[in-house]
Each structure stands twice: as C-alpha cells, then as structure tokens.
Amino acid sequence: MQSLDDIELKAHAAWDMGRAKQALKLFQQGAEAGLVDCMLDLGYFFDVGIGTRADKAKAMCWYKRAYRRGDAAAASNIAVLYQEQGRKRLAFAWYTRSAGLGDGDSSLELARLSLAGIGARRSVPRARRYLKDALGSACITQDSLELAKALMRHLDASARRASRSG
C-alpha cells in the first residue's frame, strides 16, 4: 500500500511527464484522503481543465476544502473564480482571507482593488496598508514584489505632489 506522500509525489511526477489523466486520478486519491496540497492541485485541474473538462463548480469545491484546512493559495484561487464571475465583493472578501493567511500576492491584489474601488470603496490609505503587508510578506512572487514596490513609490510621489500643491 502506498503512503499518502507517495501518492502526491507520483501525481506530480505524472503531471511533469504530461500524464494529466493519471495525475488527476492520483490527486483525487490524495485529496479524498485529506492531503491539502492535493486538494489545491485537484481544484486547479478542474479549474483549468487538465486531464478533464474544466468544471469551475468542482474547482470551487476543492479550493474551499483546501481553504478550510488553512491554505492561502486556495483562498486566492477562490477569489479569482469570483472575479471571473464578476462577483467583486466576494472576490475582495476572499483575497482578504488569503492575505490574512500571509499571501503577499493577495495583499497586492487588495491594494490594486482598493485603489480602483473594485469590491470595496476606493481607499488610498487602505491600499497603502495592503502594499505594506505585501512588501513585508515572505510569501510573494518576485513579480508581485516588484509591482508592490513600484505602486508604493507611485503613491509616495503622489502624496508628495499633493502636499506641495496643497
């Protein structure tokens, strides 16, 4: 009998070798056995349609199961699904949950949404707080980190211009 860790490793190996249907089956076994990473990957397979037809409802189900086990990436993926549906407030709420679990990319997205007034009232101070969270996060992609730095520089420059003209 193979261990749960073996199932996950075999699933990733199958995925890496282009055996999507085999990977899907293994991720499903791992997810049903309670492996959070397998839940997230299975959700992604259903979300994008890898090894199966895309099924956003099944993706949402698996992402929510992973989130209930504390997975920040799952909360972020749920937010993206809600964004795709045009459900802006729900997307904002789920990015907030993901950011609360330490996801710096979600903090950056919350800053951008706050500046644009999408999903919540426009707020530069709130955007600045989210940018600070993103910049202090250990869980942020390099691209998002660079974008957060650039956005913070832009906000700082805008504040300086406003204080000189005011």
Which residues does each PLM region occupy?
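Alpha-helical segment of the N-proximal tetratricopeptide repeat
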Residues: S3-A33, Y44-V48
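Terminal, low-structured helical/coil segments at or just beyond the last alpha-helical repeat
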Residues: Y130-G166
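Short coil/turn and helix-start
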Residues: D16-M17, E32, I50-A54, R68, ...
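Hydrophobic face of amphipathic alpha-helices that form TPR/SEL1-like repeat modules
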Residues: E8-A13, D41-V48, A75-E84, E109-A116, ...
